[in-house]
Each structure stands twice: as structure tokens, then as C-alpha cells.
Amino acid sequence: MAFSGSQAPYLSPAVPFSGTIQGGLQDGFQITVNGAVLSSSGTRFAVDFQTGFSGNDIAFHFNPRFEDGGYVVCNTRQKGRWGPEERKMHMPFQKGMPFDLCFLVQSSDFKVMVNGSLFVQYFHRVPFHRVDTISVNGSVQLSYISFQNPRTVPVQPAFSTVPFSQPVCFPPRPRGRRQKPPSVRPANPAPITQTVIHTVQSASGQMFSQTPAIPPMMYPHPAYPMPFITTIPGGLYPSKSIILSGTVLPSAQRFHINLCSGSHIAFHMNPRFDENAVVRNTQINNSWGSEERSLPRKMPFVRGQSFSVWILCEAHCLKVAVDGQHVFEYYHRLRNLPTINKLEVGGDIQLTHVQT
């Protein structure tokens, strides 16, 4: 089955985890597994690229072991039988510490990056295009598993249902005429060009757009300088996603995520631990609009804990999920979406992954 776009991520999946890789693996495909090694007594974890869910046919078994000084086993399993092990006598992971693990599929091998550095190459023993499932088990906690297909090209809209390990439950839009949010700045929206759109099924049955035609930019650095500033390729448009993961500092007071259009801040998201609030706003010509603070539940960020933020752009608003749970919508006050092409992150956090 042809795969025409980047698959939506699995957010905060419980371990052990098995999930479908839509369309199977392809040359140039990139999978990022972001999480942390547990500091418990467990001594191993594994990431498996396999056919189906039985575990009898594993094209690539990546198995860090905190034993005998630490090493990583790579192997292949065919019809329930393991092949010869390949061992890397070096341990790039630490117990109790976060990691960013990236697998790049190439015609001859898997290339594995750990925290931004090439760790190992594993030459294919079976055809990689048979792989349609990723599994993770052992002594780890996951923030997300994301997918990138750099060969994405614009095609006629395709639709599919993407499973979430934790459903992102975005509320349905109210029927009838939508009320304008405060301080709406009128502007002419730019025409929407041909886009690959996949739909994601939420637990409550609503559908919302995901997977842009423009491949996302991914920055798999072990740590980011703060403040962190980068471009958003193509700007915002309906179905565009931005994903950030990191850890809140133990003594954090505030941090912010800004989506900018020139000198304007189209979207300002500002978790404030001193006020137990997540403030949202827009700044136009150095003048702030009215704040939005309402949340459906308690503050979604916790000092000293990791987090994953998913910002999904729709025609009328941004939908924001934290750790797989929808927390709010923010109606556009600057409506020329393609001009919103810069991401700024600052404050009391450590970033571990950014995808624009």
C-alpha cells in the first residue's frame, strides 16, 4: 500500500506497546522514539521492527542491556528463530535519563542515532518492506513515537484512520454561526494549495485533519539552546502539526511557546507555575490582546516532569494537546496563516525534540 504522508505520532504510549506503521517501512523512512529509561531494577528494553503482532518475525531487534557494563544487542528473528547476535559493547543510555532514539531506514541498512549521534548500522537480513509494526517493551517510559517520510509529495487528498495509544479527544465544533473570539484581526486568508490530508479518529468519534503535504522538519538534538528559535517550513495551514517534547525544570516558574508572523506573535502559550495557569494570547504591533486561561482540568504541566505538546492547525483555530490529551482551542486572531512561519521557545524547560 502506498504511503503518501507522515503518520501521526503515538503520544505517551503505555509500555509494552505495539503499533502499526502505516504503509510499512520504505527507503528513507525515519522513526523517532522519545522517552526515558526507568531507574527501576529492570535491566533491558527493546525496540522491534516486525511483521504483524506475534513477534515471530522481527526484521530488526534493538535491545540495550544494562548488564556486564552495558551493551546493545541487534538481531533478526525469522519464523520464531533468532539469528546470530550483533553486539555493540557500548551503552549510550543511562538509567533515569531521557533519550531521543532515531531509526533511519536505508536500502542496505538501518542507521540508529542516539541523542543526535550515530550509534550503529544494522544491515538488513530480511526485506525491510515487510515491516508493518513497531513494538517497545522493557524498562522505559515513552513520550512519543513519531514518523517522517521525506519522500512525501503532494497528491490527491487521501484519508485514513490513525490509532492513538492515548486518544486525543478534541471536542466537536458547535453548529451554527461561530462567535468571533476577542481581538480578531481581520485579514484575507491565503489560498490553500493541494494538500495531503489524513484524518485522525478521536475516542469520541470526531475526525480532525492531520498529516501535511510538506514534510515536517525534525531536530533530533540531545539538548537545545534556550531560547530556541527556528522556522516553520511553509508556515501554518490546515492540517499542519508542530510537536515539542522536553522536561520542565524542577524550579520552573514559567515557559513559553510562540508562533510568530514577522514582528507579531500570532500564538503565545505561556504555562505559569506561579499562577497555576496556561495563558494564551496574541501580540500585534507590540500590543497584547485579551488573555485566555480556561482549562478543562488541572494544570497539564508538572515541575520536574517530561511533557509532549502537539499543536494542530485548523482553518479557524489551533488545537493543543499535552501528553495525548486535548487541553484547549485557540481561535486565530492573525488569519494569514502561511505568514506564521517562526517558532520561539523559551523559559524554564529543557527541550529534547522539536518537529515543525
Curated annotation (Swiss-Prot):
Annotated a beta-D-galactoside 1 binding lies at 82-88
| UniProt binding sites for a beta-D-galactoside 2 | 288-294
An example of a GO molecular function for this protein is: galactoside binding
What's a Pfam family in this record? Gal-bind_lectin
GO CC terms of this entry: cytosol; nucleus
Domain Galectin span(s) in chain numbering: 17-148, 228-356
Q: Gene3D superfamilies in the record, alphabetically? A: 2.60.120.200
UniProt GO BP: negative regulation of CD4-positive, alpha-beta T cell proliferation; negative regulation of type II interferon production; positive regulation of gene expression
Q: Where is this region: Disordered?
A: 170-190
Q: Which UniProt keywords apply?
A: Lectin, Repeat
Highest taxon of source: Eukaryota
- Is Repeat given among the entry's keywords? yes
| Cited SMART domains | Gal-bind_lectin (SM00908), GLECT (SM00276)
Q: InterPro entries recorded for this chain?
A: ConA-like_dom_sf, Galectin-like, Galectin_CRD
Q: What else is known?
A: The LGALS9-like proteins are encoded by a duplicated regions on chromosome 17; there are at least 3 genes coding for galectin-9-like proteins.
Q: Which PANTHER family match?
A: GALECTIN (PTHR11346), GALECTIN-9C (PTHR11346:SF80)
Q: In its UniProt entry, what is this protein called? A: Galectin-9B
Source organism of the structure:
Homo sapiens
Source taxonomy: Eukaryota, Metazoa, Chordata, Craniata, Vertebrata
